[in-house]
Amino acid sequence: MVDFKVVLSDPATGKAYNIDASGAGAGSFIGKRIGEEIDGAALGFDGYKIRITGASDRNGTPARKTLQIAGRRKVLMAGGVGFHPRVDGERRRKMVRGAEITQDFVQINAIVATQGSKTLAEYFAPAEPEAPAAE
């Protein structure tokens, strides 16, 4: 099956959380495009809506929202995601991925679109060890 590293950012607090998605949680991303929302319950966050904002594959090739394909393409670019020109007017052919999430992606970037009942900090709080029983 496919595994993704999901970087989930919470705009309310400004914090980002790393999630390892596998199985059904990762399957909910397959076929979605950058900008679409998924249900947070797939990752264990009840009541949350998560918006996909970007992704990259194992080589670090970024996904570009304007490229509506599922594979990789070498595109002539003048700026934006995947290319930062060194001088004004510079254009260069760069390798980018399409906006559709496939099994080839490794990392998916997302933000919280709708908050649930619990905060993300509560989901990611470290479990407190139980106090030893008093004798």
UniProtKB/Swiss-Prot annotation:
Per the record, its GO cellular-component terms are:
ribonucleoprotein complex; ribosome
Which Pfam families is this protein grouped with? Ribosomal_S6e
- List UniProt keywords, sorted A-Z: Ribonucleoprotein, Ribosomal protein
* Family, per entry: Belongs to the eukaryotic ribosomal protein eS6 family.
Q: What is this protein called?
A: Small ribosomal subunit protein eS6
Report the domain of life of the source organism: Archaea
Which InterPro entries does this one have? Ribosomal_eS6, Ribosomal_eS6_arc
One GO MF term attached to the UniProt entry? structural constituent of ribosome
Record GO biological process: translation
